[in-house]
């Protein structure tokens, strides 16, 4: 995380987790982030949801500035060398993607890019998972 703490997904078992892969230079990510803030993070953060933006391969100061510029309140984490990103996509693939993980730690939904219908489907899946 930006404050230097480390988070393991195993520590988040029992919560619905959304990993949002992002970068300050990714225009699609920047377009999606306000929607994640308003439509996912703010309504569900107190209902068992953890949303973590994972910034791909950028230095800490760049990511801090990026967080401030976007105005998001959900936590951002660093991904040096795109180590975590490469578990879900080829390192040279486009950045924008969300990985929704259920309370048991299983991947329940994946998105690519920012497309309205897919985003709505992701929100509905999150709502269902939170009720389980």
Which residues fall in each region the model found?
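Conserved redox-active cysteine motifs that mediate thiol-disulfide chemistry
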Residues: 13, 21-38
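Hydrophobic beta-strand anchors of alpha/beta hydrolase catalytic cores
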Residues: 18-19, 51
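Active-site-proximal beta-strand/loop segments in catalytic clefts of secreted hydrolases
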Residues: 21-23, 54-57, 79-80, 111-112
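Thiol/disulfide oxidoreductase modules built on the thioredoxin-like
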Residues: 68-73, 79-127
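A short beta-strand-turn-helix
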Residues: 1-17, 88
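Active-site acidic short loop of glycosyltransferases
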Residues: 12-15, 46, 73
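Structural microenvironment flanking redox-active thiols in thiol-disulfide oxidoreductases
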Residues: 30-70, 81-87
């Amino acid at each position: 995380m930006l404050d230097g703490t480390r988070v393991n997904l195993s520590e988040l078992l029992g919560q619905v987790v959304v990993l949002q892969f992002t970068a300050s230079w990714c225009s699609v990510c920047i377009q999606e982030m306000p929607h994640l803030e308003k439509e996912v993070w703010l309504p569900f953060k107190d209902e068992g949801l953890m949303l973590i933006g994972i910034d791909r391969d950028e230095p800490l100061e760049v990511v801090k500035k990026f967080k401030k510029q976007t105005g998001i309140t959900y936590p951002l984490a660093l991904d040096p060398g795109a180590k975590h990103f490469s578990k879900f996509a080829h390192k040279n693939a486009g950045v924008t993607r969300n990985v929704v993980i259920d309370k048991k730690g299983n991947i329940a939904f994946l998105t690519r890019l920012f497309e309205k219908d897919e985003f709505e489907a992701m929100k509905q899946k999150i709502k269902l998972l939170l009720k389980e």
